[in-house]
Amino acid sequence: MNKKKCMILALAVLPMLNSCSDWLDPKPLSFYSPENTYVDAAGLYAALTACERNMRHEFFGDGAPILTEMYLTDIAVHGKTDESGSLVDLDNEMLPSRTKNDMKGKNKWYWEEGFKGIKYANIAISRLDGAEYKDEAERNAVLGAAYFQRAYRYYKLTHQFGDVPYLDKEITEPKLDFYSYDRWSILEQCKKDLEFAYQWVPEVQPRGRANKDACGVLLMKICMAVGDFDRAIAVGKEVVGRHPLMTGRFTGNQTKPNTNLMHDLHSVEAKIDMSNTEGIMYVVAHPTTTPLDKDNRIYTMRNALPYWAKGGAIKTPDGKTGTAIAPDEADKNTEIDNDTKYGRGIGTCRPTNYYQYEIWGEKEKNDLRGPFNHDSWRRMEDLRYNDPGLKKTNNPYYGQNLIRPVDLSVADSIRCWYMWPHYKVFVPDPTKTQDLQGGETPWYVYRSAEVYLMMAECYYWKGDATNEAAMLNVVRARAGAEPLSGNIGIAEVLAERARELYYEENRHVELVRISYLYAKTGKPCEALGLSLIHISEPTRH
């Protein structure tokens, strides 16, 4: 009887054993698996959306990565000198063993997020031929957009880290044998890819996605990096032909007092205004398109403004605590409410004397972008003594403008007392009533103003000072600065970039690119009186 039962059980199990392989064959549980997603242009653009999101994160948030690109140049320093391990002591903190991806610095962020962007772009590139398209133009537009995203990362990585691994396809299995490639070869490949992208990516794309002229701007940068200045100029002329500068007041801000064209150009309204011809490429955060969280707030006021609310740092002339985030309740949203009028900063990104003073001379007296214009820039003396304790004690300084202390300490002058470009960094946050630090907004990645400055630099390398000045003067004229003429060089290009592109450009990347070009071309640097002969041989000093 037991034998019979065993035979029956065995016969019952046999079919199950035969179907075992079917049980173990994994089936995707999600409609969004790669096999179900990357089947058409829309699916592949979804992969590139991850690239666009990471582009936004470079500019947004407390201690945004773009600040590290500013600390490592002539326009800003890390203001938190009281925080150990921050990017203040560069000799020790920029070593390979001291990589950072926190509030103290973000050099590691560029490495990690750079290769993440390359990974997402390579997914679209590798899966391109497995999808269906309505025509060749749609296919090539997707490929061009992916090429843009990959080149966007490699342009930065090759100038931040030099020779790096080059990945040109999706990695689908564990891989440990990565090797660095020559940076020049990587840039040449990116140039080839971007020529394709510039041909095929449409001129009109949804805001936040790379369009034809965004591809053109990046192509210009890479042409400049490899020394092809004529091609960069040719592309630049085409781009500015399609994207003229905004030279007249626009947006609803034009009716507000104490504003000018620069306030219009850098307002939230301007960056969502489809008639804004100057904007070429944006990263996008807006309550209608992105979740409301700290990663989607720009935090420009927190990062760039002085730490005016630091306890005890700002005192009245009679020695009392002078400022507070919130004034007396009766004085909220008035002239003495520094928080709502200017924003609450913590002095993370402190502008240098070069950016505050040295680049603003007699020719910039009427420049709308500079500190001579008191609507565009703010000083600590514009703020008010507003600590509620002053009002309670009937202190006569309550509500008065700040007075520079005669005994201002070095520490306080670094983090708590300096000028700043209010027009550029003031971003309202309608979701908050206090502690305003910079809300949601689109942000410029590329503008045609930069294209003119890039063409000016190309003419510098070609030794054509006349056209160099002409390109710079297009941007200067719009801002109200006097024209440049005569013997100008790289210093004028870099000063104009600082005036125009604060908190927009990857200035460290651009300075490294220029350094490589001096080495590649052998052209003497007139700004420092240096040439290749000073550095090319170990015996020379």
Positions of the model-derived regions?
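Membrane-proximal, proline-rich intrinsically disordered regions
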Residues: C20-T68
